[in-house]
Amino acid sequence: VSMLAPQGDALVFTLSGLSKAAGLPQMKLGWIHVAGPAPLRDEALERLDWIADAYLPVGAPVQHAAARWLARAHDVRTAICSRVEASRAALDCRLNAGGATRVLPSEGGWSAIVQVPRVHSEEEWALQLLSRHGVLVQPGYFYDFSTEALLVVSLLAAPEDVASGADAVLDLLKTFSFDRRWSIL
């Protein structure tokens, strides 16, 4: 069943744009597919049209280039998927080796969640990685995770950079003195 197909008597809004479709987050062009019962759909489209005209103009350069970008979108998405898979493998190889860190399972996306020992706050982990190693991660609380200590790592970086960042986590772990009771397990 297509995600664009109407589901019963409800309106279904499917959002997309150049950011995800063509790997171009800096080029602001998005669209909404509206499905559902004709009267509700038509009213929603009228309102969306007004909002788009009033608040969401698309720049002429983006309009001019959009067709070419979309024609190349499949190749870009394929390259992004390959890079994300390779970066994930590099991260898994280093941080899932049975030590005090682990990469949590995921079902997709271009970020990984790394669980580290709760010897310091997520913020302290992030700050230490940045100041000591130049490695940028985000603390899990940015994403409203309810448990500590989680770090969110971008998988869009080159696999060798992700591997280097993982090595920095392990190096930093060596400098933290902690009792094994504080391990993540």
Go through each PLM region and give its residues.
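Surface-exposed helix-capping loop/turn segments at secondary-structure junctions
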Residues: 95-104, 177-181
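Short hydrophobic/aromatic beta-strand micro-patches
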Residues: 33, 113-115, 154-156
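A short linear hydrophobic-aromatic micro-motif
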Residues: 14, 99-103, 136-141
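PLP-dependent enzyme catalytic core of the Aspartate aminotransferase-like
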Residues: 128-137, 143-185
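Short, solvent-exposed loop/turn segments at secondary-structure junctions
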Residues: 19-21, 39, 108-111, 119, ...
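Conserved glycine-rich beta-strand-loop-beta hairpin in the small C-terminal domain of fold type I
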Residues: 67, 82-92, 102-116, 147
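Conserved PLP phosphate-binding loop immediately N-terminal to the Schiff-base lysine helix
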Residues: 1-3
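Conserved core segment of the aminotransferase class I/II
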Residues: 5-85, 173-174, 178
